[in-house]
Curated annotation (Swiss-Prot):
Family of the protein in this entry: Belongs to the protein kinase superfamily. Ser/Thr protein kinase family.
SUPFAM superfamilies: Protein kinase-like (PK-like)
Reactions catalysed, as given in the entry: L-seryl-[protein] + ATP = O-phospho-L-seryl-[protein] + ADP + H(+); L-threonyl-[protein] + ATP = O-phospho-L-threonyl-[protein] + ADP + H(+)
Active site residues according to the UniProt entry: D134
Keywords tagged on the record: ATP-binding, Kinase, Nucleotide-binding, Serine/threonine-protein kinase, Transferase
Domain of life: Viruses
Organism placement in taxonomy: Viruses, Viruses incertae sedis, Naldaviricetes, Lefavirales, Baculoviridae
PANTHER family: SERINE/THREONINE-PROTEIN KINASE
Protein's UniProt name: Serine/threonine-protein kinase 1
Domain Protein kinase stretches: 16-273
PROSITE patterns tied to this protein: PROTEIN_KINASE_DOM, PROTEIN_KINASE_ST
Length: 274
């Protein structure tokens, strides 16, 4: 047995699964592992059926391994029916869970989170040529004690210009709905939707009521707005304009470039957060 297999074998033998932490998702099962020799060290293991596995997920882990906003991977192994990825366990809630407990976040915290998220996406785009393709509340963690945003779950990442169409409908840009090839603009549009949700406690910019489930037809129709007043649930005018700039229907008028987005007055202005 070579050194890598020996290391993996020892690691698996030394870990205990914390059953209460198990989470089952559409593209895999996740459970938390307690590494007994180190007493307190926890790892997250994602198990993916072989037919749902994408090597791009491993590539992104490898390519972004030194980035503070990406989750470190320690092992990846497979059987004939499944793959498993063992990575750092980040002990904090995702943004969906945060909104469930805290409601709408204050502007300063939203700016802090969105700035870090934009930086992480820009680094992913420029360093690897990958599009995350599933930016949403559930895939972004904010660890308040570290003041650190983590962008996670790389299972739907694809190279720019790939002709694949996956993700979460309520974050789809008009071009993604029209089944254009992967583009960086997909991620930036999703950031606009995510920012709106943070500012409103989980509401979607195009829903008519808090309990409405948006379908494809509703998204197609309501994306064609051209007045920031439609985003009236966001009271701060700079914040409202930021969301508007990232979610405008007309691609030529929309903010789709990191430098342009980072200079927006909402992100560039000073806020008393820390």
């Amino acid at each position: 047995m070579d050194a890598a297999l020996q290391s993996l074998s020892r690691f698996v033998a030394d870990c205990a699964v914390l059953a209460p932490k198990v989470v089952n998702g559409r593209f895999g099962k996740m459970d938390v592992l307690h590494h007994r020799p180190t007493t307190s060290k926890l790892f997250l293991r994602k198990t993916i059926a072989a037919h749902s596995f994408s090597a791009d997920e491993i590539n992104v882990h490898d390519l972004m391994s030194d980035h503070p906003s990406f989750v470190d991977m320690y092992f990846c192994y497979s059987s004939p029916t499944a793959w498993a990825i063992v990575m750092d366990y980040v002990p904090c809630p995702d943004l969906f869970e945060t909104l469930q407990t805290q409601g709408a976040l204050d502007n300063a915290l939203v700016v802090n989170i969105v700035r870090q998220l934009c930086d992480a996406l820009n680094d992913l785009h420029n360093a690897t040529g990958y599009i995350h393709n599933d930016v949403k509340l559930e895939n972004v963690l904010y660890f308040g004690a570290r003041d650190r945003v983590y962008l996670c779950d790389y299972g739907l990442c694809k190279r720019e210009h790939s002709p694949v169409h996956d993700g979460t409908l309520e974050y789809f840009s008009p071009e993604k709905i029209r089944r254009h090839n992967y583009a960086r603009s997909f991620d930036w549009y999703a950031v606009g939707v995510l920012a709106y949700k943070l500012l409103t406690g989980g509401r979607h910019p195009f829903e008519r009521s808090a309990d409405e489930v948006l379908d494809l037809a509703s998204m197609r129709r309501r994306q064609q707005y051209n007045d920031p007043a439609a985003l009236k649930n966001v009271r701060n005018l700079m914040a409202r304009d930021f969301v508007f700039c990232l979610t405008r229907f007309n691609f030529e008028c929309r903010s789709t470039d990191y430098k342009q987005i980072a200079k927006h007055s909402f992100l560039a202005s000073r806020h008393d957060y820390i």
